[in-house]
């Protein structure tokens, strides 16, 4: 009964606040009609926001009130001796007990979770900001990503920096960068920034700046990304000049020297792949690339670009839209995703536990990357990923950070010293280092 009274009091209080807020909104509207300057417009916007927030809270309290009243009515109803709820369609009692009631009022099925992001709007929003706040936010959502998401889950956070501001009648006002931190039940709007979308768009727009500041996500750091991208341009050139296992060009009489070799190279295979990608362009992504090309962003134009691989330095969960139509780029991201799965499989294999516990430690970065990237309108060429793995797989795996770099002899000696000291001071069994 006390809960019902508390909700009723909250409804009364919010209704009073709403009346006052609506009066202030009317006053602000009249002020803007008389003097429509930026300060008055800003005040009007904040008044509208306050009214909207109060209306939402009031509606939520009314829903809670209805739920409490409904629950009380259900409690007052006589219990059916069969144990079946009154509105259950079963004729006989189920072997399962009744569980929680899941309230789906807040879910908007017009904008389902997992929908394709509006990359043009997201990119346009990001490009408006100064580079320092973008890179600092990227650092917080990649290098410190896990902690940032954990501390702010279920909220819409604002990044603030002195480099990001706007002038309103000569008054400097902070310009915040908004990012939503969804929970598993959250529904995201197409133009709404989440940590995954933020990393994706920023990595695609500013790879040269990310390379210059050496911003690398921990999940990329542990697979040896910094080692792998060293001398990237030379590494890719050598790769592209190699013979492609999927092309066979027979020399023809009178053919110029080296033409047959070129036509059977990996470079020729990627040129064919580029021709296929050129036919799959989406207008929104083309518009985003044009918008980015006219400003500060540093989009890679080919796989051989020195900062091309840095598009994936912060582990975006899909290929960034700004380079999705460059042959080999989407596949390079898939290659990195496979490497992450390979490292996690190695780590799971060496841990102690049951087979089921080890399986839980495996990851599915590749499947997630594949699904998200293909939702943007392209199919990945698995042959290119295979060629990457043949060429670089062994080299990268040998540079994985597996968290166990202690020399076996050093470990054995250290353990012997631990065992000896523990026996001297106690009768307990010494732990393993």
Swiss-Prot record:
Chain residue ranges for the region called Homomultimerization: 1-79, 100-125, 377-425
Segments for region (Interaction with host RPS19): 150-175
Motif position, YxxL: 178-181
GO terms assigned for molecular function: endonuclease activity; RNA binding
Coiled-coil intervals: 4-71
Spans annotated as Viral panhandle binding: 1-175
Localization terms from the record: Virion; Host cytoplasm, Host perinuclear region; Host Golgi apparatus, Host cis-Golgi network
Region of interest (Viral RNA-binding), ranges: 175-217
Alphabetized InterPro entries for the sequence: Hanta_nucleocap
Region feature Interaction with host DAXX, mapped onto this chain: 377-433
UniProt keyword annotation of GTP-binding present: no
Segments of this protein annotated with the region RdRP binding: 1-50
Region named Interaction with glycoprotein N: 80-248
Family the UniProt entry places it in: Belongs to the hantavirus nucleocapsid protein family.
UniProt protein name: Nucleoprotein
Lineage, highest ranks first: Viruses, Riboviria, Orthornavirae, Negarnaviricota, Polyploviricotina
